UniProtKB/Swiss-Prot annotation:
It is found in: Nucleus. Residues 305-402 form the SWIRM domain. GO terms for biological process: chromatin remodeling; positive regulation of DNA-templated transcription; positive regulation of mating type switching; positive regulation of transcription by RNA polymerase II; regulation of transcription by RNA polymerase II. Pfam families: Myb_DNA-binding (PF00249), SWIRM (PF04433), SWIRM-assoc_1 (PF16495). It comes from Saccharomyces cerevisiae (strain ATCC 204508 / S288c) (Baker's yeast). This is SWI/SNF complex subunit SWI3. Coiled coil: none annotated.
Length: 825
C-alpha cells in the first residue's frame, strides 16, 4: 500500500492547499516529505524501522466480509504501526476531520476535506509505514487512507497525548521550504480542529486497546476503509454491532464527499505534474517574484522643437483664453461633438504628430485621416495652430504646399468680335486701304439731288410737313390757318386726315392725335450780326450757362440762343477747295480727307455711323430743328442754282469763319481744363526741383560745417603741441645751463692737470651729458613717459632708436570719436 498512501497524502496536501490558497507550496512540501526529508531524529529512526518491517512483511489479502465487515492485517505489521501511533496521535483521523469539514463548516471550506495542517500531512507521510496494495486498489485508483486514532493508556490518561501535541505544534517551523517560498502555518485553526476531534473521540468513539497496545479499530476509520474497498486494520477483531447503524450513515455521506474528491483529484494531478517539474529543478536559494509593470510607450526626443516667442502662452495641458476667443464653437456647450475635451484631443493630436518630425509639413488631410470629427472645424483648428506657429513653424519654405493655379495665358493671341454697327475702342490705326473719297464726298453733298444725304433730308422734311401741316379742302381754310399759324402751333391737332400711315388704318379708326413741338415757336430767324457776336462772346465767357448767355445777348431767350447756336454750321464747304462749291477734285474734300483716321473707318458706312454717333449726343428735339434748318438751306441753294455769279460769297465765308471760331470758343473749356492740369503738373514739378535743390545746398552746408569743425580741432591740437614744445624748450635750456655751470665750477675749483682721476671722470661725464642734451633734447609726448624720464620705459632703446609702443598712444576712436566718425564714413 505504499503507492496508495502516497497518493492519499498528496490528496490531503492538495485539499489543504485549496483552503489556504497555496497549492504549489503544499504540493512541493508533500513531494519533499515523500522523498525522505526528515525534520527530527525520531523521524529518521522511524524510517529505519519501516525499512526493516518491509523486509519481514508478508502479503495480506485485502478481502471484504459483507457480514462482519472486518479487516485483517498480519501480525508482522503490528509493531510498526504501533510505533507510528505516537506521531499520529496529536492529529485527528483523516476521515473524521474530513467529515467535520463537510458537515460543520461552510460550503466555501468544503474543499479542505481532511482538516490537517501542512506540517501534519508531511509528518504523517514521513512516519507512515509502507503497506502493499492489492490489484483492486490500483484499478479503481482510490487512495487507501490509514485511520490514525487517538492513543490512550489502560487508565484512560491522555497526558502523553497532550505533551506530544504541544511538541508537535512547535514542529511546523522546521518544515522544508521549496522554491524559496515559506509555508505559512495556522496553529490556531488546526489546534481548534484537533480539540474538537479529541472531544468526539473521548465521548463517542473510544477505541479499545489490546494488552499489547494494539488498536482494534474505530467506527469512522472502518467506514472509510469499507468505502474505499481497501484499508488497514489494527487488529483482526470484528467491528461491534452497536456501531453498524452509524457506520451505514457515514458511508452514505462519505460517498458523496468522495465524488467531490475524485473531481478534485483530476485537477490536482495536473498541478502535481507541474510541481514535480519545479521540484526537480528547485534550488535551495529563495527566489523572489516581481511583478512586471507594463512599459509606457515613450519616444525619445530626436528634434529640437521651436515655437515663436509670441506663442509662449501655449500649454498642452491647458486651454488659453486666446484659443477660446479664436475657436468659440468648442466652448459653447451647444454641440455634443464639440466640447473642450474634444478640442484638447484634436489640438494635442496635431501638435504631438507635428513634433515627432517638425521638419515635415503636417497637413489638414493627415489630421482628417486620423481624427474623426467636423472637417471644417479641423480645418479652422489647423489654420489657428499654423497662424500661431505651433505647427509647421520649422518646415522649410520649399516643402510648404503651393497654390495650384493654371498657367498664364497673357501671351496668347485673342480675336475681338462685335455685332455689326459697333466698333472696338482702340487707339488710332491707319487703314491699309483708303476709301474712295470722291464717292464719299458725293454722298455728303446736299446740293446734289442724287446723293443719299439729300434724299434722307428730303424724306424727313416731307414727313414733318405732313405732320405739322395736314392738307385742307379749301383755300380759305388754308388762309385762315396761315393767319392763325401761331395759334395752331400751341394747340393739339385732332384731324383725322390721311397721313403717311393713314392707309394702314381701318374704317372707323382714327390715328392718335399728334402733338406739335413747342420748340418750333421759339425759332427766330431775325438774328442780326450784333446778336450773333454777342452770342458767341457770351458762349466764350459763360460756357454752357445759357441764362447768362441770353442775358448777354439781351433780346433773346435761352431756348432761342441754343437753337441759333445749333443752327450755326460747324464747317463750310466754301472754306475749302477752289470756291466753286463743287468739290470735284481731291483738294475740295475738306475734313473728309482725314476719314481713314476716324474711329468709324472700319464700319460699313462710316459717314452714317459718324452722323448717328453725333446725333446720339444731342437732344432729339434739337436734331429735329437742325434737320429743318438743313432742309431750308437745301431749298435756298436749289433756288440759287439758276443765278450764276462769278463773285464769291464773301459774307458766307465770313459767317463760316465766325462759326468755326465760335465752336472753338464753346469747346475752349475742355482745352482750358487740360491746360490747367498741365499747369498743375508743371508747378508741382517745379516745386519738387526747388526742394531738391534746397536739400542739396543744405547737405553741402553740413559737409562744410563738418570740415570746419575738423580744422578747428586740428588747430587746437597744433596749439597744444606748440605750448608743449615751448615748455620743453625752457626745461631743456635750464638743464643745460645747470650742467654747464656745474662743469665750470669743477674746472675753476681745481686745476685740471693737478686734479685726480675721479674729478676728471666726473668732468668728462658732465661734458658728455651736456653734449647729449644738446644733440638730443628731451621732448614731451602722450605716452607713458611724457618727459622721457630715465627710470621709466620709453619709446627709445639704448642705441637711440625709437620703438613704437601701441599702448603709449590711444586710438582715434577713443581720443577723438567725432573725427573717427567722419573718417570711417
Amino acid at each position: 500500500m505504499e503507492n496508495t498512501l502516497g497518493e492519499g497524502s498528496t490528496v490531503n496536501a492538495s485539499v489543504d492547499v485549496d483552503q489556504h490558497g497555496n497549492d504549489n507550496n503544499s504540493d512541493s512540501n508533500a513531494n519533499a516529505a515523500v522523498a525522505g526529508v526528515a525534520n527530527t531524529d525520531t523521524a529518521g529512526e522511524e524510517s529505519q524501522q519501516q525499512d526493516e518491517s518491509l523486509k519481514d512483511e508478508a502479503t495480506v489479502p485485502n478481502t471484504r466480509d459483507a457480514e462482519s465487515e472486518a479487516i485483517t492485517v498480519t501480525a508482522k505489521q503490528q509493531p510498526t504501526m504501533q510505533a507510528n501511533k505516537l506521531d499520529s496521535q496529536e492529529t485527528p483521523s483523516t476521515e473524521e476531520s474530513r467529515a467535520q469539514n463537510v458537515f460543520g463548516q461552510d460550503n466555501e471550506d468544503s474543499d479542505n476535506l481532511f482538516g490537517e495542517t501542512e506540517s501534519s500531512v508531511s509528518n504523517n507521510e514521513a512516519n507512515t509505514p509502507s503497506i502493499p496494495t492489492n490489484p483492486v486498489d490500483n484499478e479503481n485508483n482510490k487512495p487507501a487512507i490509514k485511520e490514525d486514532s487517538t492513543i490512550q493508556d489502560s487508565n484512560g490518561d491522555v497526558k502523553n497525548m497532550e505533551d506530544v501535541k504541544i511538541q508537535k505544534e512547535e514542529e511546523p517551523e522546521n518544515n522544508t521550504v521549496i522554491e524559496g517560498v515559506k509555508e505559512e502555518s495556522q496553529p490556531d485553526e488546526n489546534t481548534k480542529e484537533m480539540d474538537e476531534v479529541e472531544e468526539d473521540d473521548e465521548d463517542d468513539d473510544q477505541p479499545m486497546i489490546s494488552p499489547d497496545n494494539s488498536i482494534f479499530g474505530d467506527t469512522k476509520s472502518e467506514s472509510k476503509q469499507l468505502g474505499n474497498t481497501s484499508s488497514v486494520a489494527n487488529t483482526p477483531s470484528e467491528i461491534p454491532d452497536a456501531h453498524k447503524a452509524e457506520q451505514e450513515d457515514i458511508i452514505e455521506k462519505t460517498e458523496s464527499v468522495d465524488k467531490k474528491v475524485d473531481s478534485g483529484e483530476e485537477r490536482n494531478e495536473q498541478e502535481r505534474e507541474i510541481m514535480n517539474d519545479h521540484s526537480k529543478s528547485a534550488n535551495p536559494k529563495k527566489t523572489t517574484i516581481t511583478r512586471v509593470e507594463p512599459e509606457t510607450f515613450e519616444i525619445p526626443q530626436a528634434h529640437e522643437i521651436v515655437i515663436p516667442s509670441y506663442s509662449k502662452w501655449f500649454n498642452l495641458e491647458k486651454i488659453h483664453s486666446i484659443e477660446v476667443q479664436s475657436l468659440p464653437e468648442f466652448f459653447t456647450n451647444r454641440i455634443p461633438s464639440k466640447t473642450p475635451e474634444v478640442y484638447m484631443r484634436y489640438r494635442n493630436f496635431m501638435v504631438n504628430s507635428y513634433r515627432l518630425n517638425p521638419n515635415e509639413y503636417f497637413s489638414v488631410t493627415t489630421a482628417r485621416r486620423n481624427v474623426s470629427g467636423d472637417a471644417a472645424a479641423l480645418f479652422r483648428l489647423h489654420k489657428f495652430l499654423t497662424k500661431w506657429g505651433l505647427i509647421n513653424y520649422q518646415v522649410d519654405s520649399k516643402l510648404l504646399p503651393k497654390n495650384i493655379e493654371p498657367p498664364l495665358t497673357s501671351q496668347y493671341s485673342t480675336r475681338h468680335d462685335a455685332p455689326r454697327g459697333l466698333f472696338p475702342f482702340e487707339s488710332y490705326k491707319p487703314s491699309v486701304q483708303l476709301p474712295d473719297m470722291a464717292k464719299l464726298k458725293k454722298m455728303m453733298n446736299t446740293s446734289d439731288s442724287e446723293s443719299t444725304l439729300y434724299k434722307y433730308l428730303k424724306e424727313s422734311k416731307r414727313k414733318y410737313d405732313e405732320i405739322t401741316h395736314p392738307p385742307s379742302t379749301t383755300d380759305d381754310e388754308n388762309g385762315d390757318k396761315n393767319d392763325n399759324g401761331g395759334k395752331m402751333n400751341n394747340e393739339v391737332s385732332t384731324s383725322t386726315s390721311m397721313t403717311g400711315d393713314a392707309n394702314l388704318l381701318e374704317e372707323g379708326e382714327t390715328s392718335r392725335p399728334l402733338k406739335k413741338v413747342k420748340i418750333l415757336e421759339q425759332i427766330d430767324e431775325n438774328w442780326s450780326k450784333e446778336d450773333l457776336q454777342k452770342l458767341l462772346k457770351g458762349i466764350q465767357e459763360f460756357g454752357a450757362d445759357w441764362y447768362k448767355v441770353a442775358k448777354n445777348v439781351g433780346n433773346k431767350s435761352p431756348e432761342q440762343c441754343i437753337l441759333r447756336f445749333l443752327q450755326l454750321p460747324i464747317e463750310d464747304k466754301f472754306l475749302y477747295g477752289d470756291g466753286n462749291g463743287k468739290g470735284d477734285n481731291d483738294n475740295g474734300l475738306g475734313p473728309l480727307k482725314y476719314a481713314p483716321h476716324l474711329p468709324f473707318s472700319k464700319s460699313e458706312n462710316p459717314v452714317l455711323s459718324t452722323i448717328a454717333f453725333l446725333v446720339g449726343l444731342v437732344n432729339p428735339k434739337t436734331v429735329q430743328s437742325m434737320t429743318q434748318r438743313a432742309i431750308q438751306s437745301a431749298e435756298s441753294i436749289k433756288s440759287q442754282k439758276e443765278e450764276i455769279s462769278d463773285q464769291k460769297p464773301i459774307e458766307h465765308i465770313k459767317e463760316g469763319s465766325e462759326i468755326a471760331i465760335s465752336s472753338l470758343g464753346y469747346r475752349s473749356h475742355i482745352f482750358a481744363t487740360n491746360e490747367e492740369r498741365q499747369m498743375n503738373f508743371l508747378t508741382n514739378e517745379l516745386i519738387r526741383l526747388q526742394m531738391e535743390k534746397l536739400d542739396a545746398k543744405l547737405n553741402h552746408l553740413k559737409k562744410l560745417e563738418k570740415f570746419m569743425e575738423l580744422e578747428r580741432k586740428t588747430l587746437e591740437r597744433q596749439q597744444e603741441n606748440l605750448l608743449i614744445q615751448r615748455l620743453n624748450f625752457n626745461q631743456n635750456s635750464s638743464k643745460i645751463v645747470n650742467v654747464l655751470s656745474k662743469c665750470l665750477n669743477l674746472i675753476s675749483d681745481s686745476n685740471i692737470n693737478n686734479s685726480s682721476v675721479a674729478e676728471k671722470e666726473e668732468i668728462r661725464s658732465q661734458i658728455d651729458h651736456f653734449k647729449s642734451m644738446l644733440s638730443k633734447p628731451e621732448t614731451l609726448s602722450i605716452g607713458k613717459n611724457p618727459f622721457n624720464k630715465p627710470n621709466i620705459e620709453t619709446g627709445e632703446n639704448h642705441n637711440g632708436q625709437s620703438i613704437s609702443n601701441e599702448n603709449d598712444v590711444k586710438p582715434i576712436s577713443i581720443e577723438a570719436p567725432q573725427f573717427y566718425r567722419y573718417w570711417s564714413a
